[in-house]
Amino acid sequence: MITTKELRNKFINYFESKNHSHQPSSSLIPFGDDTLLFTNAGMVQFKDVFLGIEKKDFSRAVTVQKCLRAGGKHNDLDNVGYTARHHTFFEMLGNFSFGDYFKKEAISFAWEFLTKEIKLPVEKLWVTIYASDDEAFDVWHKHIGLAKERIIRIDSSDNFWSMGDTGPCGPCTEIFYDHGEDVAGGLPGTPEQDGDRYIEIWNIVFMQYNRHADGSTTDLPKPSVDTGMGLERISAVLQNVHSNYEIDLFQALIKKAQQVTHAKDINSPSLKVIADHIRACAFLIADGVLPANEGRGYVLRRIIRRAIRHGNKVGAKEIFFYKLVAELVSQMGEAYSQLIDKRELIEKTLIKEEELFLKTIENGIKIFDAEIENLKDNTISGEVAFKLYDTYGFPFDLTADMAREKGLKVDEQAFLAQMQIQKQRSKEAGKFNVDYNSLINSQVKSEFRGYSTLIEDAKVLEIYQDGQLVASTSEQVSAVVVLDKTPFYAESGGQVGDKGILEGVGFEFVVEDVQKSGEAILHIGKLVKGRLNLNDELTARVSDKPRLATAANHSATHLLYKALKLVLGGHAEQKGSLVDENRLRFDFTHDKAISRSEIEQIELLVNQQIRANYPVTTIETSQQKAKSLGAEALFGEKYGDIVRVISMGDFSIELCGGTHVAYTGDIGLFKVTSEGSIASGVRRIEAVTADKAIRHTFTNENKIIAIKDSLKANDTNLIDKIKSMLEQIKNQEKQIAKLKKELLSGSSNDIKETSIGDIKIVVANVDGVDVKTLRNKIDDYKSKNTKVIAVLTTTNADKVQFVIGVSNALTTLIKAGDIAKELSSHIDGKGGGRADMAQGGGNNSANIDQALSQVEKFILNNIKE
C-alpha cells in the first residue's frame, strides 16, 4: 500500500522530472487578496501570474498546497465528520503551466501519472469535458486512446471555470474513478451523479479566454493550465477505501483522538471531526492566526470549539485537543517543517483556548437544553443562538451542530440580524484607504533606484486623475504620476511611502504618498505649479529627513524583533508593523503582558546593538540560500525568487525590501513608549528612535522633576515620599467613609419610615454621602427586616444617585428594577438592576422631594394591588 506521505512525494518527483519547478505551499492566509478569507486552491499563489501582473522565472510549476474551506463562500464545516470526503483543511496536488504547454501535454501528464506512476486501472477511469471543447475530446480520444463512451460532454458550469466575473477563464476536463458496482451512484451528468461510485479525482482547467465586463470573451495571448487533485481523495483510491477518513494519515489521528478522549466507539463521527479539525487548527496557528472574535481568528475559534465539544460528547473529561499535535507532527512534520518549528506555540494556544471555553461550555449547554425543553416547534430561535454566542462563546455552527443531533434547526436569519445589530453598535469609523490596484490598472514598469540615491532624473510615463489615464494635468489638481525610474519608496512591508517633489521646467508636483500597482510605482500628490505632461523630463527628489528617520525606525524594528525572540522566546512571531518618520509599531504573538523587567532587557539588547555600530549589509540571493543563512521572513510580505537579505552584524538577519540605515549606530537611541494587547494572544509595542527617543526621555525626566518639586523630594527619598502620601490618602479615604457612615446613621432619625402591615417602606434623600454608603445602608435595612422596601438618594449639584433594595420575600409584589424606572422618569435619569437590588442616577435634582413622593405612591399602589 502506498502511504499518503509517499504519494505526496511521488507527485512532486514526477512533475519535477517533467521540468516543473517545485514551489512550496503558500500560507493559508492569502497575501494581498481581500477577496479570500483563506487559501482554498493551488492556483491562489499564482493568481497574479495568471493575470499577467507578476512574472516568474519559470513557466511550469508543481505544488502541494495547504487549503482551508471553513468560512465565507467556501465553507465545508457543517459537513465535516458526517461525510466521506468533506474537510476543513486539505492538501491540493497541482501542476501549472504559465503560457507553456496546453491541453495535449496537460492531459498526457495526468494520464501518465495516474496509469503509469501510481498504476490505476484504465478501465476504472472516466473523463468529462466541456460540451463544446472538441480539442480536449480529440486529445482524449485520438492521442490518449480513450474510448468515446468514456468521454462525457457536460454542458454546464461544472466544466467551465472562471477566476471571477471578469478575467481569465476557460473549459476544464475532469477525471473520475469508478469505485465499482457495489457502490451506489451514477456517471457524471446523470441524475444519480451525486452518489459515491464515480468520484472526481483530478480537475484540469484550460485558461484560454479573457472574459470582459459585457460577458464577451477573447482569446488569451498565452493560454495557461491550472490543475488540482485532492491528496486525501486520491490516497483513498490507492489505499482501496471509500472514505478519506480511512486513509493512513487520518486513521493515525483518529486513533490518537480516541486515546485522549477515552471514546468507546472508534467509528464515531466525533473522532473524525477532531482528526480533521486538529489539522486545520495547527496549520492556521502555524501560519500566524490566533483565536479571536472576528475575522480569521474567529473561524479558528469556531473550529477549536467544535472539536472540543465533540471531544466532550464522546467522553473527554479534561483538556485533550492539544495532545493530538504530537501525532500530527509525526504524520506531517516532514512535509511541513513549520509544524515542528511552531509546535510549542500550537500546543500553548490550544491549551489556553480549551481552558477558556471549558469555563463557559457547561452553562451554555444548560441554556441550550432548557431552550429545547420549551420548544413549541423544531426551531431554536436566533435570539437564543445569539445569547449562546455572545455570552458563552458558542459559534453559530456549534449551536447548529448540537441542534442537528437533536433533529432540530436554528433560525439563522434571526441570528444574523442580532449579529448585525451588535456590529452596528460597536462599529467604529475606519480610516479610508484607496485601493490603487483596483483603481489604476497600470501596465508599465517603474525602476526603483531609491536604495542608493534620493535624487533621480526621470520621465513621465503615465498620469492619472480620478483613476483615468490623462495626457496632462494642471495646477492645483490632485493626480497620480508614474515614472520610468524613481528614488521614491512605495509603501510595502509596513514601511510608509516616501514624500518629496517632482520638479521640471516650469512645474512642481508635491508627492504626498507612494504606492504600487503591479510593477508601476505611483507618485500620489498635487501639482502646485505649472502643467505636467506625458513624456516630460523631471527630477524626482525624496525628502531626506523623513526618509532617514523612517530608515532608522525600520532598522530598529529588525533589532527589536530579534530582541523579542531572545527575551520572550521563539514563539514571538511578527504579526504586523508600521514604520514612519515619527515612530515604529510592532505587533507580535505573545499570550501575556510584557513585564517592566522584560521591557528593560529588550531596550538594553537593542541599544547594545546600536552602540556596537554594526554595518547594515545587503545581499540579493535565492530564497533557498536566504533560508539556509537563517533569514527571518516577515509577516504579510510577498517575496520573489530573488530576495533581499538585510544583516546587522551577527545579531539580525531578515528578508526585507525596505530602506535602512548604513550602520546600526545611525539609529541613535531606542526607547519603548507603550506595550499592550490588540487581540487575543497578540501584543503591540510602540517605540521611538534617535532625536524622538531623546525627547521622550527628556519629557519623562521633566515629569519626574515636577513631581519632586511638588513633593519637596529628591532622588533618594522620592519613592518613599510617594508611598507615604499614598498611605495617607488611603487612611483619609477610610476616615471619610467612616464619617459618611456616621452621617447617614445620624440622619436615620430624620428618615421617614412607613409601615403597611408587616412591610416597612423607607424613602429618603440623604446628602453628603456616596453610592457605596447608600448601598451599605440598604444592605443594613435588608439584613434587619425580612420585609422591607428601601429607596435612598443623594444629590450633588444637579446630579442624583440612588440605590433601591427590596426583600426577597416581596419581589413577587414589586421589583427594585421597576421602582428604579419610576424614579428615573422623574429625575431625567436611568437605572436598573435585579428584582431585589437596583441603582442608577439622573441629571435633575431640583424636584427630588417631589420625585420621592411619587415613588412612594408608586410603591404603595403596587403593594395594595
From Swiss-Prot:
Enzyme Commission number(s) of this protein: 6.1.1.7
EC supergroup of this enzyme: ligase
UniProt KW Protein biosynthesis keyword: yes
Gene Ontology terms describing biological process: alanyl-tRNA aminoacylation; negative regulation of DNA-templated transcription
Binding site residues for Zn(2+): 554, 558, 656, 660
Keyword match Signal: no
Catalytic activity entry: tRNA(Ala) + L-alanine + ATP = L-alanyl-tRNA(Ala) + AMP + diphosphate
Broad class of the protein's primary localization: cytoplasm
Alphabetical list of SMART domains matching this protein: tRNA_SAD
Subcellular location as annotated: Cytoplasm
Pfam families per UniProt: DHHA1, tRNA-synt_2c, tRNA_SAD
Origin: domain of life: Bacteria
GO molecular function term, any single one: tRNA binding
An annotated GO cellular component: cytosol
Cofactor: Zn(2+)
Cofactor remark from the record: Binds 1 zinc ion per subunit.
Alphabetically ordered keywords of this record: Aminoacyl-tRNA synthetase, ATP-binding, Cytoplasm, Ligase, Metal-binding, Nucleotide-binding, Protein biosynthesis, RNA-binding, tRNA-binding, Zinc
Cross-referenced InterPro entries: aa-tRNA-synth_II/BPL/LPL (IPR045864), Ala-tRNA-lgiase_IIc (IPR002318), Ala-tRNA-ligase_IIc_anticod-bd (IPR018162), Ala-tRNA-synth_IIc_core (IPR018165), Ala-tRNA-synth_IIc_N (IPR018164), Ala-tRNA_ligase (IPR050058), Ala_tRNA_ligase_euk/bac (IPR023033), DHHA1_dom (IPR003156)
Comment field on protein domains: Consists of three domains; the N-terminal catalytic domain, the editing domain and the C-terminal C-Ala domain. The editing domain removes incorrectly charged amino acids, while the C-Ala domain, along with tRNA(Ala), serves as a bridge to cooperatively bring together the editing and aminoacylation centers thus stimulating deacylation of misacylated tRNAs.
Primary role: Catalyzes the attachment of alanine to tRNA(Ala) in a two-step reaction: alanine is first activated by ATP to form Ala-AMP and then transferred to the acceptor end of tRNA(Ala). Also edits incorrectly charged Ser-tRNA(Ala) and Gly-tRNA(Ala) via its editing domain.
Family: Belongs to the class-II aminoacyl-tRNA synthetase family.
Protein name in UniProt: Alanine--tRNA ligase
